[in-house]
Amino acid sequence: TVLILGTGGTHNTTSAVAKDKGAARVLTVSRHPDPEKGELSYAEAVHSGADIVINTTPAGMYPNVGVCHLDVAAMPGLEAVLDVVYNPDKTELILRAEEAGVPVAVGGLEMLVAQAVYAAEYFLDRKFDDAPAEIRAITAQLRKEQLNVALIGMPSCGKTTIGRALADRL
């Protein structure tokens, strides 16, 4: 069972792909559920028996980074949580999924890069030799450029020394 958070355009695409890939059930969650459309509330979603959760809403996107409407810790048996939000790299939903021990928790940066790579193939009318490898490499480079390191500690505990060593390696 795939549980999709949100009802917009990305939901429609995600739902179509989930069905195409053989999902037994695809359920939709909304802040304002329409029972006639079979939509669930976030409270109901926790008890849906979902295997995979996909967030297609802007919840958790910068600057509202602490927002998370779904209690994934109360959803035993989750196999994966995917979030289309790419800024921050790890949304509150992804952080909570990792904390709950969900085996796969992935943010939206790789999806954003994949869209760009496949759009480039389309508009340039040529295929990249290894698009998946290209996507992984670009995503890794972007993460390296975006993420930072904060060293915290008491005076004279070695922050400067560690900072210099990191600067040499990064």
Language model regions located:
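Conserved lysine of the Walker
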Residues: 159
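Conserved S-adenosyl-L-methionine
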Residues: 20-25, 99-103, 169
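Rossmann-like adenosine-cofactor binding region
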Residues: 37-105
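Adenosine-phosphate binding glycine-rich loop
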Residues: 84-147
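NAD(P)-binding Rossmann-fold cofactor-contacting core
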Residues: 20-38
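Glycine-rich adenosine-cofactor-binding loop
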Residues: 1-19, 23, 153-155
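Hydrophobic positions on the alpha1 helix immediately C-terminal to the Walker A/P-loop
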Residues: 162
